[in-house]
Amino acid sequence: MCALALVSVIPAAQARGHHHSHGHHGTPWCGIYLSHYLGKQDRNLALARNWAHEGAPAPGPGVGVVAVWPHHVGIITGQAADGEWIVHSGNDGNAVRTRPRSLAGVIAFRYVS
């Protein structure tokens, strides 16, 4: 319920140009989901790219590190046997998923508490 309340306050201009599926109100929701998942109350984190400034910089991927792409955000939860990182995120195929994911294109790795 809390996540739905955040959806209504995101300006439409922020949602433009997002290549992932949009939720019920036409809003990209990966940032909203991660905010809820991590217990964050900052509306600015609804936009994936804004996670690039949250917390502290991490030197690279690792379990518990937030990975930020230009239009997506998720948290690394493990590493597959082949070395690919496992990422938990919302709005991954319009669903919440935990799966191996390429980190190509990541613009920031962040420690977020």
Regions found by a protein language model. Give the residues of each.
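C-terminal segment of classical bacterial N-terminal signal peptides
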Residues: 5-13
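Catalytic cysteine-centered active-site loop
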Residues: 16-63
